[in-house]
């Protein structure tokens, strides 16, 4: 799980948005870091989903 950081750089979890809608079991999640000072909004990156076997949009979850 993401741990608390003392500075502006924090760990965030990215979860696939297309996988939830497909109804297939399992989830595709990535852990990355972001700088809260530079990117205040939630991250949205294209990452590879091994279950769907293609690149999909992954959004930051709380």
UniProtKB/Swiss-Prot annotation:
InterPro entries according to UniProt: Ribosomal_bL33, Ribosomal_bL33_sf, Ribosomal_zn-bd
A molecular function GO annotation: structural constituent of ribosome
Gene3D superfamilies xref list: Ribosomal protein L33 (2.20.28.120)
Lineage: superkingdom: Bacteria
Keywords associated with the record: Ribonucleoprotein, Ribosomal protein
One BP annotation, GO: translation
GO cellular component: cytoplasm; ribonucleoprotein complex; ribosome
Family of the protein in this entry: Belongs to the bacterial ribosomal protein bL33 family.
Protein name: Large ribosomal subunit protein bL33
Species assigned in the record: Bacteroides fragilis (strain ATCC 25285 / DSM 2151 / CCUG 4856 / JCM 11019 / LMG 10263 / NCTC 9343 / Onslow / VPI 2553 / EN-2)
Gene: rpmG
């Amino acid at each position: 799980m993401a741990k608390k950081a003392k500075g502006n750089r924090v760990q965030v979890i990215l979860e696939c948005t297309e996988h939830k809608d497909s109804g297939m079991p399992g989830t595709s999640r990535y852990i990355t870091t972001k700088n809260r000072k530079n990117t205040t909004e939630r991250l949205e990156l294209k990452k590879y989903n091994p279950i769907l076997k293609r690149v999909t949009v992954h959004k930051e979850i709380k």
